Amino acid sequence: MSGNYGKVYLVGSGPGDPELLTLKARRLIDSAEVIVYDQLPGKAILDSMPASAEKINVGKYAGSHTMTQAEINEVLVQKAKEGKMVVRLKGGDPYVFGRGGEEAEVLVAEEIEFEVVPGITSAIAVPAYAGIPVTHRESTSMVTFITGHEDPTKEESGLDWETLAKFGGTIVILMGVKMLGRNAEELMKHGKAPDTPVAVIERGTRADQRVTVGTLANIASLAEERKVKAPAITVVGDVVHLHDILGEQRTGVDF
């Protein structure tokens, strides 16, 4: 590592509720010279960025990208080589479908010091705020996380739908709004029961959180009817029934 270079922190900001930001993340944001951010952390966290920091909006949100991933990598490298303390601020956890691993590889190749600061992943926190524990002693002892937005350049899907359909635990799908209907069809086509409970949780952990509950057979039509939009988490499995019992949790913070 070069002694003249700065350092990059890949910081997870959690699912959106600003009070779920870790103490370390808060400290690093407050002391950053440069913050490279997208929209997933949410307005409350973004509004709390220090005025003294240089802020670079890379705009990755719901298919609207101000910069490509390659351009983001270049910014991180450039600012670090200028000797700056850089925070790459991400929603959730940097290493859970956050492309943090790709950014870390680039930093290693450029001999730039970096540190990963884990965040509370939305895959667990968002269902929790909707009254849906992803595991439950009486319902399931297993959970799997999958992406609903694979790399479009892949020749074949990396998802094994046959195995997922047979999986007896909870399936949590991140970034899956656009492909909600296709995902439900794939699970049913490979043997998952059409009446399997499904919940789609929009803007989870935020004051305007909204939950749509249905089944594999009707969730796509319900989502279309309710005009469901990203960001949203989809939960598939028997634990969804607990939403009616455990209720919703809201922050009361408008963000």
From Swiss-Prot:
Could you tell me the Gene Ontology terms of the biological process aspect for this record?
methylation; siroheme biosynthetic process
Enzyme class per UniProt: transferase
- Which pathway does the protein contribute to? Porphyrin-containing compound metabolism; siroheme biosynthesis; precorrin-2 from uroporphyrinogen III: step 1/1
Q: What catalytic reaction does the record list? A: uroporphyrinogen III + 2 S-adenosyl-L-methionine = precorrin-2 + 2 S-adenosyl-L-homocysteine + H(+)
| UniProt keyword annotations, A-Z | Methyltransferase, Porphyrin biosynthesis, S-adenosyl-L-methionine, Transferase
CDD domains with a match to the protein in the record: SUMT
Q: Drop me one GO molecular function for this one.
A: uroporphyrin-III C-methyltransferase activity
Q: Does the keyword Methyltransferase apply?
A: yes
Q: Where is the signal peptide?
A: none
* Binding positions for S-adenosyl-L-homocysteine per the UniProt entry: P15, G91, G92, D93, T121, S122, M175, A232
Enzyme Commission number(s): 2.1.1.107
Q: Which Pfam families match?
A: TP_methylase
The entry's family comment says: Belongs to the precorrin methyltransferase family.
Q: How does it assemble?
A: Homodimer.
Question: What is this protein for, i.e. what is its function?
Answer: Involved in the archaeal biosynthesis of heme. Catalyzes the methylation of carbons 2 and 7 of uroporphyrinogen-III (UROGEN) to yield precorrin-2. It does not catalyze the overmethylation of precorrin-2 to trimethylpyrrocorphin.
Name this polypeptide is given: S-adenosyl-L-methionine-dependent uroporphyrinogen III methyltransferase
The root-end lineage is: Archaea, Methanobacteriati, Methanobacteriota, Stenosarchaea group, Methanomicrobia
